[in-house]
Amino acid sequence: MLRVRGRSGTKVYIFPSLMRLLLYENLSPKLKKFLSDVYPGTTHVRDVGLHAAQYEDVWRYAAEQGLTIVSKDSDFRQRSFLFGHPPKVVWIRLGNCSTADVEALLRAHHENLITFDQDAQGSFLALG
């Protein structure tokens, strides 16, 4: 359990998630380190040799490894609607933003992501 300060200065407790994320190439590989306290087991496509891979290859890898794809790319959104899960997809809808913005978004929606991960019906979650 982590204790961090919320925006209002109040103490907020965050429990690490068992949810494992696969960060797509349009997100910084640095996010893996930045989010390791709340999303341990997170990896980036570069870490597993999938940099510049076809969407189908990333999709298949995530499904086989039990990972949730996190991307700013709408192609995964479309695949999610067509094929369902696994894998689940989190679509970051922040446009042109910093790595810190993406990190803050994933931290702010930690509880939503855990609920999404545990939802047997949910395949797709849009954030931002």
Model regions and ranges:
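Intrinsically disordered, low-complexity and often Lys/Arg-enriched segments
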Residues: M1-M19
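N-terminal beta1-alpha1 ligand-phosphate binding loop
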Residues: M19-K30
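Residues at secondary-structure transition points
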Residues: L22, G49-D57, C97-D101
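Short, basic, glycine/proline-bearing loop/turn elements
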Residues: Y39-V48
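Acidic, metal-binding active-site segment of PIN/NYN-like and related structure-specific nucleases
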Residues: Y55, A63-S80
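Ligand-binding "clamshell"
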Residues: R79-K88
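C-terminal structural segments of small proteins and small subunits
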Residues: P87-G128
